Amino acid sequence: MPSCAYCCSCGPKMPALQLLFLACLVWGMGARTAQFRKANDRSGRCQYTFTVASPSESSCPREDQAMSAIQDLQRDSSIQHADLESTKARVRSLESLLHQMTSGGVTGTQEVQEGLQGQLGALRRERDQLETQTRDLEVAYNNLLRDKSALEEEKRQLEQENKDLARRLEGSSQEVARLRRGQCPSTHHPSQDMLPGSREVSQWNLDTLAFQELKSELTEVPASQILKNQSGHPRSKEGDKGCGVLMWVGEPVTLRTAETITGKYGVWMRDPKPTHPYTQETTWRIDTVGTGIRQVFEYSQISQFEQGYPSKVHVLPQALESTGAVVYSGSLYFQGAESRTVLRYELNTETVKAEKEIPGAGYHGQFPYAWGGYTDIDLAVDESGLWVIYSTEETRGAIVLSKLNPENLELESTWETNIRKQSVANAFVICGILYTVSSYSSVHATINFAYDTNTGISKTLTIPFKNRYKYSSMVDYNPLERKLFAWDNFNMVTYDIKLSEM
């Protein structure tokens, strides 16, 4: 190195110069990781240069690739520049001592040696500090490069996800637009007397849930093939309107299949005593999976029910419990969530007209049917009106049957049976007779008990009842159509029945 050559030319026989030569060798060994160079510039002034090589880069990065990191390194470089100036000052002091030695001979050699040793030790410490700081800067720089690469990769992934989401949204929008172009026009408009805000909520639910409804499929027998009369659904023969005892239940006929998970079990119904503006075709449906169940889908026409286009979505002011709801004379009757209260909700005005506690009735899992589902309180309709099926602590889980006033929900009459509620899967009433289903999952279930409120006598039966889809969560009787309505594992089905004369 030039600095070493300069030192050695001053006289190798002198001890001080030998020590300085040793310092030059030590300095040269340290130059493997850093270089300290001394040279004259164009104007003849002496300049000292300290150089550090990058351990990982063959060339310097562009300014636009690591501007932030470079700015940080520049701040650290200014600190090191100050340290370097201090080192230069010490070197100048060392040169001054050498000059004294060369001009003054051997005089004061001991003092000069001590001064040189002190200066050499200080220079070594300065060099070690600078090397440590340089390594720290290299590590920090490498970390910044890694962080920059990671951020760029994350940005690329987010951009790709954004493109995928935009593509999916566009596809969904096109599908919804296509489906809506074929949607049946709504024929029923919300009442002007509906609860404040319910119109907006109903419309919102129609927009978001109709798309799921559109995916529902008809299976087994198309509903259009079994709708034989002008009104759009089967009717009893004119001479077959009298009451009787249940003798036979036909094969299940599937009208609709719900695809969404909320359709695992639920309740669907038509009004056996319809009032304006509703007709014999108007159908209601409630998916009862989950909690906070408040949505009631209304279909004004059979075709809307077939195709999955609700004409309206009611939002109940209070959540309902399980699958025991019925529609009768223009009102929806249901059990309030986690309570023994039965409510009457007038569908046309969207208002609660009456509510009443069923005295002592078990609720929320105390006395459900065999399949569970919080089916403690089950409402039913027959030729004579509205009924409620439940149990109490006093009857130790046996079924209690009460006749309800449809206007104010007062109990008019009550019967206690000897049929344990949790031993049967479901129950319904025909002509004042309570019938129970033996199993909710067996394909070869039976109508196994009957309790006659006219005589107070119960008896066992073995009328075949097929659970085709092996999870019947609701069975109700419609006296207008003389059919059983059921919800069997996502499927809305009906059963023809035969009654004998009483």
UniProtKB/Swiss-Prot annotation:
Post-translational modification: Palmitoylated.
Residues annotated as signal peptide: 1-31
Induction of synthesis: Up-regulated by dexamethasone.
Chief location: secreted
UniProt keyword list: Calcium, Cell projection, Cilium, Coiled coil, Cytoplasmic vesicle, Disulfide bond, Endoplasmic reticulum, Extracellular matrix, Glycoprotein, Golgi apparatus, Lipoprotein, Membrane, Metal-binding, Mitochondrion, Mitochondrion inner membrane, Mitochondrion outer membrane, Palmitate, Secreted, Signal
Coiled coil feature spans: 82-183
GO cellular component, one term: extracellular space
Subunit structure: Homodimer (via N-terminus). Can also form higher oligomers. Interacts with OLFM3, FN1, NRCAM, GLDN and NFASC. Interacts (via N-terminus) with MYL2. Interacts with SFRP1, FRZB, FZD7, FZD10, FZD1 and WIF1; regulates Wnt signaling. Interacts with SNTA1; regulates muscle hypertrophy. Interacts with ERBB2 and ERBB3; activates ERBB2-ERBB3 signaling pathway. Interacts with SNCG; affects its secretion and its aggregation.
Name of the protein this chain belongs to: Myocilin
Organism whose genome encodes this protein: Rattus norvegicus
Gene name for this UniProt entry: Myoc
